[in-house]
Amino acid sequence: MVLDANIKAQLNQYMQLIENDIVLKVSAGEDDTSKDMLALVDELASMSSKISVEKAELNRTPSFSVNRVGEDTGVTFAGIPLGHEFTSLVLALLQVSGRPPKVDQKVIDQVKKISGEYHFESYISLTCHNCPDVVQALNMMSVLNPNITHTMIDGAAYKAEVESKNIMAVPTVYLNGESFGSGRMTLEEILAKMGSGTDASEFADKEPFDVLVVGGGPAGASAAIYTARKGIRTGVVAERFGGQVLDTMSIENFISVKATEGPKLAASLEEHVKEYDIDVMNLQRAKRLEKKDLFELELENGAVLKSKTVILSTGARWRNVNVPGEQEFKNKGVAYCPHCDGPLFEGKDVAVIGGGNSGIEAAIDLAGIVNHVTVLEFAPELKADEVLQKRLYSLPNVTVVKNAQTKEITGDQSVNGITYVDRETGEEKHVELQGVFVQIGLVPNTEWLEGTVERNRMGEIIVDKHGATSVPGLFAAGDCTDSAYNQIIISMGSGATAALGAFDYLIRN
């Protein structure tokens, strides 16, 4: 039995939603992965009379495709889609059977209009929380458009293929045999990358907003909901809705929710925002902000939006270590997400740069996968919580180096080592390894506001207790501000504060 009793009980409910007959075409060998895949497929077929199984010769073995009767959909799983990809399998079964996907009709129409042949391949790991978004988006595109096919490839089942392509980060997507992209991508982002996204003309007729929120993370979502509930015209411009929360695996300090994952919380935020009359403009990057009679926000696509007030909630991103080799070997051994990319370094030696909570958590996670972890901390002592340090020092395959100034990440086609300077002795040292995980904190996404609003030396927007900035009518919230702490729950509170501050400003002006 591949599926445990709890999963089978949940799956039984979804099986009732299958609308039409589907055929699982299976290509299997004598290896253990093939046997496990066959067991999974047979178990699925036993749970619904609408699922049948056929043997087939597919491009990869082991693999299976999900098809309509008499029609190949192009949806293929190479490997066993369990772990984080089990949801991708369930959605594929439902959508291939005829159940409509839960996306805007406008997006569905964009997918259906795509012409030409597009053969996508996504390389994933079953522990990657960013991968399902990509897999599910590409599967959906394959179901909607016969010109598109997609194969999900589990890197653990196809190690030789992954190594031959020098793939060291997931998800990594190939299109028609060429590299297409890596990292989390939503359906809208994929369409934009293919040249089928939203252009400036679609913003031309928008009336001025009362409040325009720039950023779609926890602070932005909170601000938008609070202003919309006041009955004023609200818009949200977001580069990707959910923000950095999408890259957070485990969340256990969001009060009233014992434990959740970033993507789940981001989905809940978006669902909540959509309950209100809020104009959400996703996949849009802000370029310039200017105050005239109204605020004018210029987007990268050339569109200009106008608003009486603006709330900046652009968040923050992972800080780069800014040494030679970091950008050259990004996704070729340099990584920022241990949950996603850790499994690709199984049995190898890696370094973690950073001794704060995120760095030590990464080192602990990686120690269970890789051969050895070297932690490099610039300061004389680690900054992580004591409970994390205690756990770290109990691990036999971890070395901690303090007073270490990273000088260079070395490599050829991929990372082969890291060079650092001992800050006490001045001695330069080199460690041979295959991966470097950078975990040194955050930098606010405020560079585009240079000269527009007062910021501190860290680039954080300075705000008062109402969320107001140095510019009347301009407010800010969340990790892009000079808040004392960067936490999801604090960002949400600051978003509400900025929203109420903006509403009060509108009343008085």
From Swiss-Prot:
Coiled-coil positions: none
PROSITE patterns for this protein: GLUTAREDOXIN_2, PYRIDINE_REDOX_2
Annotated residues for binding of NAD(+): 349-379
Disulfide bridge positions per record: 337-340
Keyword Metal-binding part of the UniProt annotation: no
Cofactor: FAD
Biological process annotations from GO: cell redox homeostasis; response to reactive oxygen species
Family, similarity comment: Belongs to the class-II pyridine nucleotide-disulfide oxidoreductase family.
PANTHER family: THIOREDOXIN REDUCTASE 1-RELATED-RELATED
Protein name per its UniProtKB record: NADH dehydrogenase
